[in-house]
């Protein structure tokens, strides 16, 4: 009986962990710019310390929202341009290229691996950045 109770408690606690939720393209509104999120290659999401899931339409909006928010962040997510799946923002490699327009016009796309980013760089000249470099770049939608 005690073992069953411990298992049930563990299951309940794991259900409380909040990660990103799938972005509903064509329905969700960007938490930063309020535009409807349309392009599944560029979405992003912040999960606040309180578990609020804040969808964004681009990496640029995510950067601005995080910089302006007074809420603590639990996790940050960006969409891998290749697979269209949410990946951790801190581990992604970013391509900044004027040849690959993003929803807010800054030309930033995210990739799960350096190899994928380098493949995109061959098609869309620009520069590759990691999360720290991207945050320090001063990129903004303003």
Residue ranges and their predicted role:
Residues 22:
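Residue-level marker of regulatory loop/turn positions in helix-turn-helix DNA-binding domains and
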Residues 17-19:
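Bacterial signal peptide processing site
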Residues 12-15:
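C-terminal motif of bacterial Sec signal peptides marking the signal peptidase cleavage site
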Residues 6, 51-52, 106-107:
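Short, flexible active-site loop motifs that bind/organize anionic cofactors or intermediates
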Residues 31-70:
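Post-signal-peptide N-terminal segment of Sec-exported extracytoplasmic proteins
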Residues 2-9:
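Sec-dependent signal peptide recognition
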Residues 26:
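Short metal-coordination and nucleic-acid-contact micro-motifs, chiefly zinc-binding Cys/His arrays
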Residues 74-142:
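Thiol/selenol-based redox catalytic cores and closely related redox-interacting motifs
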